[in-house]
Amino acid sequence: PVRPLALDLTDRSSFATYAKALTEEPVEVGLLVNASGFGKFRAVVDTPLEVNLNMVDLNCQAVMALCQLTIPYMPEGGQIINIASVAAFQPIPYIDVYGASKAFVLSFSRALNRELRSRGVGVMALCPFWTRTAFFDRATGDGGQENVVKKYVAMYEPEQLVQRAWRDAKRGKDVSQFGFVARFQTGLTKLLPHSLVM
């Protein structure tokens, strides 16, 4: 059965609501996908503090909390997929807070995957390149730094990422990336100084 829960994941009281829903009746969670998140393409000093705080709350705090609350209800063979970003691998001006929040998701997911090995539960960070979603409408819709996006050469469809993510999760990977451009850019961050890849 499906039971929808409308939650504001930037509000900590939502975690209590979610935890209560898990205990109200016997439940087993075979798959958890943490896909909520947002970014802003603008300088830190030009972004309202409340926006950046909400970004960290949603992109980091909510991912950690939902994982921690859900894990006790996951059977052996269960899977957690946390949506990170190719931005997790390098500092990127004008999306600094977003990129740093996704670096948290990447690091947290990889470490948690190792922790849960004995339970038989997998954790994978999906690190997509630019993807054609409503994310960009919110990120640039109020005069943000659209050129941050325009300078990149590829834009992928969500269906492509889902297929790749599901395949990689079944293979037990802790990180999933789709497309040559994403893997190439990530490779550069391991070889070149940050000053050259930013």
Locate predicted features:
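Active-site helix of classical SDR
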Residues: C67, S101
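Residue(s) in the substrate-gating loop at a strand-loop-helix junction
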Residues: S85
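Active-site loop-to-helix junction immediately N-terminal to the catalytic Tyr of the SDR YXXXK motif
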Residues: T47, P91-G99, A111
